[in-house]
Curated annotation (Swiss-Prot):
It catalyses: 4-(3-methylbut-2-enyl)-L-tryptophan + S-adenosyl-L-methionine = 4-(3-methylbut-2-enyl)-L-abrine + S-adenosyl-L-homocysteine + H(+). Homodimer. Keywords: Alkaloid metabolism, Methyltransferase, S-adenosyl-L-methionine, Transferase. 4-dimethylallyltryptophan N-methyltransferase; part of the gene cluster that mediates the biosynthesis of fungal ergot alkaloid ergovaline, the predominant ergopeptine product in E.festucae var. lolii. DmaW catalyzes the first step of ergot alkaloid biosynthesis by condensing dimethylallyl diphosphate (DMAP) and tryptophan to form 4-dimethylallyl-L-tryptophan. The second step is catalyzed by the methyltransferase easF that methylates 4-dimethylallyl-L-tryptophan in the presence of S-adenosyl-L-methionine, resulting in the formation of 4-dimethylallyl-L-abrine. It comes from Epichloe festucae var. lolii. Transmembrane segments: none annotated. Pfam families: Methyltransf_33. Induction: Strongly expressed in planta but not expressed in axenic culture. GO terms for biological process: indole alkaloid biosynthetic process; methylation. Belongs to the methyltransferase superfamily. This is 4-dimethylallyltryptophan N-methyltransferase easF. It is an enzyme of class 2 (transferase). One of its GO terms (molecular function) is methyltransferase activity.
Length: 344
């Protein structure tokens, strides 16, 4: 099998939009940093290292379930489907599903989507394509929205069954209202056309609300470099946009990494883990083009949340999104489960 192609499906160059998101996020209250800032090449490497630690139960439970249930999941995917993986940073989970599809001799087109072209090429290069005859591989370079637009409009995809993969607790990164809106948006884009009744979402959710277990998972090795790498990436983006900056001189960079800590907290009221960056010891006056912005000593700059869903919250999510759960896959001792969703 030939080397998988990577399709550039970007509707806009999001590197520039990330800079704007950083500026806007730091000018509002409470201050935030955009998730896109954290998943550049080096950031993904740190995240993969972090997620492979023994304490990071979500990944280990996902792999455990997929190893046992992949054949059942694969059986639910129609022949001649397009499978789009929204968040394909690592193959160690989805490979079990792909191998099950191959065993079942299903002719499937698998598309890995990523905002990083180089990460996408690396991911696809790791696929043992020589072991697959029925499953075909390609990459989509773009954002979630780009991927959904492509599913709806691309001639090679729009009229065949679609399965959208949301592994890695991706939907938990959205606020509860935004999670419902995103699932609804998938339905509007991916579940239309001639094969709409055969389309589905396969996604994972975490129900664990034990603070000690959650906090151990999100503070284990690798997470601090992952968090701080975002500031290095931001410095590079600002340097590109403002050519007058001397990128090799720390004093001209927007962010000084030595001034920041990673903060991990469990929010009992909202049922979510919260990840933030916080000044180490003093107020931080940001440098141009963020001059005029002050981050106070005890002020949190939040960059990520991971919402946990009990049964009632799952039902509320599915109802608000206009989808119904067809099948649930989990395993003994697991807080994580996979759900197959279709339009209700």
């Amino acid at each position: 099998m030939s080397k998988p192609n990577v399709l550039d499906i970007r509707l806009a160059t999001f590197e520039d939009s990330i800079v704007d998101l950083v500026i806007n996020g730091l000018r509002k209250q409470p201050k935030t940093l955009p998730a896109l800032l954290f998943y550049a090449n080096e950031g993904l490497k740190h995240w993969n290292h972090h997620s492979h630690q023994p304490e990071f139960y979500p990944r280990h439970q996902e792999v455990q379930i997929l190893k046992k249930k992949a054949q059942e999941m694969a059986a639910s995917i129609p022949m001649n489907s397009v499978v789009v993986d929204l968040g394909s940073a690592s193959l160690d989970k989805v490979i079990h599903l792909l191998e099950a599809l191959e065993v079942q001799k299903k002719n499937i087109s698998y598309y890995a989507l990523d905002v990083s072209a180089s990460q996408l090429e690396s991911t696809l290069a790791a696929i043992p394509t020589q072991n697959f005859r029925h499953v075909r591989f390609a990459g989509l370079h773009g954002t979630f929205d780009d991927g959904l637009h492509w599913l709806k409009e691309a001639p090679e995809a729009r009229d065949v069954p679609h399965t959208v993969l949301l592994f890695g607790l991706t939907i938990g990164n959205f606020s509860r209202p935004n999670a419902a809106a995103f699932l609804s948006n998938i339905g509007q884009h991916a579940f239309q056309g001639k094969s709409g009744d055969q389309c589905s979402i396969l996604m994972s959710l975490d129900s664990c609300k034990v603070p000690t277990q959650v906090l151990r998972a999100y503070t284990c090795e690798g997470v601090v470099p992952f968090a701080l790498q975002s500031l290095t990436y931001a410095n590079g983006l600002f340097s590109e946009k403002n050519k007058t900056q001397a990128s090799g001189d720390v004093q001209h960079k927007v962010f000084n990494l030595d001034e920041w800590y990673y903060l991990s907290e469990w929010n009992f009221v909202l049922g979510r883990h919260e990840a933030s960056l916080i000044p180490r010891s003093k107020d931080i006056k940001l440098l141009p083009p963020l001059d005029g912005i002050l981050v106070s000593k005890d002020e949190k700059v939040r960059f990520g949340c991971s919402y946990k869903y009990d049964q009632e919250e799952r039902m509320e999510l599915f109802a608000a999104a206009g989808v119904k759960n067809e099948v649930t896959w989990s395993d003994e001792g697991c807080d994580v489960a996979f759900y197959q969703l279709k339009l209700s």
